[in-house]
């Protein structure tokens, strides 16, 4: 049986996601660190998988630490391209160029 997530935690994560500027990406771990849960990047992924039930958030701007896209989010690439984010030959976001500098 899976644990039910506290709505306040969900909104805390989603509010950080909402701060990611257009044309940039953040990693799951980066979001986790920003909310004080540095070792809970999977929690961030879990929340993002349910984000549509909480409102309209730019979840397409969150990738893994190597710039890989979410495997079950086919429109993620198109949305990032539309914002000017370029991809390396291996299909990953160039994290050196497009990683959001959040000050963390």
Language-model region placement:
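Nucleic acid-binding interface residues in structured DNA/RNA-binding domains
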Residues: 2-104
